[in-house]
Amino acid sequence: CTLMNMNYQATLKSKAQHIRDCITRIGGADDVLRAMHGMEKPYAYRNRVQFPVGGKAGAPKVGFYKGNTHDVIDLPDGCMLLKPELNHARAIFAAWLRDSNLAPYDERTHRGIVRHAVFRVSRTGALMAIIVVNGSKLPGYEGLFRALERVGCVSLVLNELTDAPGSRRNTEIFGKKFVTLCGKERYMDEILGCQFELSAPSFF
């Protein structure tokens, strides 16, 4: 997003120069980077997103952090880089969270429930939703799953990430415990004819 004010070819040159500088500075190698090839349509391609949750009960913000802060900027119109299913999932989740009146987690007071929503979508349109909470429960999750099924959700997973009272700000996205609330424990994706079964914590 920080490069969206530049045209696409300029962003490719900027990224290539950054990589070239790192290879030279860290690896001590010069002239090893080949030409960078861009996409025909550099939008709506990202298949995974994590949305921090802010605001208050009844008026949540579901979006991204403002630069160099943990202040959540709401994203009602979605993100141009995300696949459409992810923007639809964000809107459904935000509406459900507002209507459920659940409190977003507050890093300063260590109170509230919902911390993050992470969505992943496969090339076939199968969606996995991972809701990160403070504690071990997500009241009303059945209604959320039914709503997300309209955009292809096949799995709703709860992740527990709880801070100890008096602890410093936790910058992690996931805790260690994942619990499948509805649907499948894994979903399928495919690359170059190879199929993969993916669980919530997998890196793909």
Each predicted region: which residue ranges?
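Accessory RNA-recognition modules of RNA-modification enzymes
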Residues: 2-204
